[in-house]
């Protein structure tokens, strides 16, 4: 099922429906828009009929120069069964030929008071967000010092309890248990919570709590870009864990690779503080300050100096 239909654009952007009401449930499957200027001149070989069509001042001014026969021909060619809608911008008058073609084809004809450039930008941003590839991940998403940290791990390892401690320390909860992730752009993942469990946190033995009610509106966020993954796992004595931080592990979600840190869990470890420091250290690395790399370089210099002596 398509995620966006023409009626969604009408509601989102307060568009005026001129005609073609029977077609407002037409699907929109691409975020690309079309301004059919070359089509107005009669070239329809590569006409992208499946896109939302925008008619601005330039297109309609040129349209006025055509003969009556050409006007009818061009508008019939524009209004296809595939076309989600045609939007006339700047509250311009709708040509009679376009109105007639819309009625005959059942294609929605809409009008907006916004300029073509402004409406085009807003439509593109809206459609890219709605049509972006999506997935769901079992975990907790928290905004820590501006870093979107996705905490993963097997059930019962302590993800929600750690998130609760982070919220108490002033950070913001985005989602618990199920994180809906959409790829809004290349290398850009945005996580949010399903509407049903938004702002809720499940603590074993305590039950479900409403974080916004308990800690205030400043303790939650509706969405956050994900830049770091921290995986919690029960401490395995046979496994060698990274002790320097030189090797950077990656995790792929949809088509984006994220930095992943594995934290072993055992009694006595304050996971909330460790995750806080991991987020701050991640920010430092992005700013060009890598403590592990600096230590490694100092160590190599000391070894070389010792060998020379």
From Swiss-Prot:
Keyword Kinase: yes
EC nos: 2.7.11.-, 2.7.4.-
Transmembrane regions listed in the UniProt entry: none
Chain sites annotated for binding ATP: 153-160
GO CC aspect terms: cytosol
Residues annotated to bind Mg(2+): 160, 202
Family: Belongs to the HPrK/P family.
Protein name: HPr kinase/phosphorylase
Species name: Bacillus cereus (strain ATCC 14579 / DSM 31 / CCUG 7414 / JCM 2152 / NBRC 15305 / NCIMB 9373 / NCTC 2599 / NRRL B-3711)
